[in-house]
Each structure stands twice: as C-alpha cells, then as structure tokens.
Amino acid sequence: MRIPAFVLALMLLVLSPAHADPLKVAVFDFELLDTSLQGEVNGPQADEQRRLKDVAEQVRKALAEAGRFVVLDNAPVNAAAHASNLQACGGCDVQYAQQLGADIAITGVVQKVSALILNMNIYLRDTRTGQLVTAMNADFRGNTDDSWSRTASFLLRNRLLAPNYGAPQ
C-alpha cells in the first residue's frame, strides 16, 4: 500500500520528537463496537463503558507526559461527542476538535468480537484537512481492566509515541 506523500509528511511531523511546538490534540472518549453474542443478549455493560473512559484518559495522560502534545479539555464538546458515533459520523470528530482549537482529533474504538476476543483501534485525523493521519490497532484477549490498559500501553509505546513510527523503512 502506498502512502500519499502529504500523509507521510504529516505523520512524520506529528510523530517526530523534534517537532518544535507541541501539537494540540483532542482525545475523545473511546467507543465500543460490540458485535458479540453477549452484547446482543445483555446490552451495554457498565464495566466496559467505564473502561472506554479509562483507556481514553490513559491516552490523554501519556500524550501530555510525552511533552510533544498539548491535550485539550473536551468539556465544551463532550455532550455532542457522546451523542455521536464518532467512528461513523462523517467527520464530526474533526469538527468537534476544530471547535476546541486542536490540530489533531484522536478517536478510539474497541470492538468486542466475543466475551474473550477484542480489538482496540486508535485514529488520528488532521483537523485542517479531515484526512486520516494514521491508524493503529491491536487484538487482545480477556475483557478485564488489565487487558484493556495493557493494550493501550502497547499502542502508545510501540505506535503512537514510538520514535520512528510512520518513518519510511
């Protein structure tokens, strides 16, 4: 797969430790896509809803501590964001992030395939163009606080905050 030059340049700009000014990011609470039989029978589970917020907060904290990002407060758009399906709203995540003054909109979705098998996805979109800058995902096993947190840590450490992530090989 070829990556368009402008996307590659933006990825390198966003993910480069040498970037002079920290990028302003809006990290929205993660969303759950529950395609499991358990989800169809039982509906949303309180522990999973809490984990979605916990994982988003983990991402916010890691980005702020990295020093390459300014994590913006989502309070002014939280109600609208929570009322939207950010993964399929036609770019409303970018519009909300623009309202906050963000350079990058960060959304995440956890897909629950079964009671045991899940997948975490994180997406970064440029608020000027609406284009996807990068996406990362990881499958994980076990629907526990620890498995969700470890998966987010893996994506942060080995993708989003990795020094050479997105650089040509």
Predicted regions and their residues:
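Short acidic, glycine/proline-rich loop/turn micro-motifs
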Residues: 36-43, 82-83
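C-terminal/domain-edge helix-coil "capping" segments
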Residues: 20-37, 54-57, 65-67, 94-99, ...
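Bacterial N-terminal signal peptides
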Residues: 5-15
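Conserved Rossmann-like nucleotide-binding pocket used by diverse enzymes
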Residues: 16, 26, 106
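Charge-dense, low-complexity intrinsically disordered segments
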Residues: 42, 46-50, 142, 146
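N-terminal, post-signal-peptide region of Sec/Tat-exported proteins
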Residues: 45-76
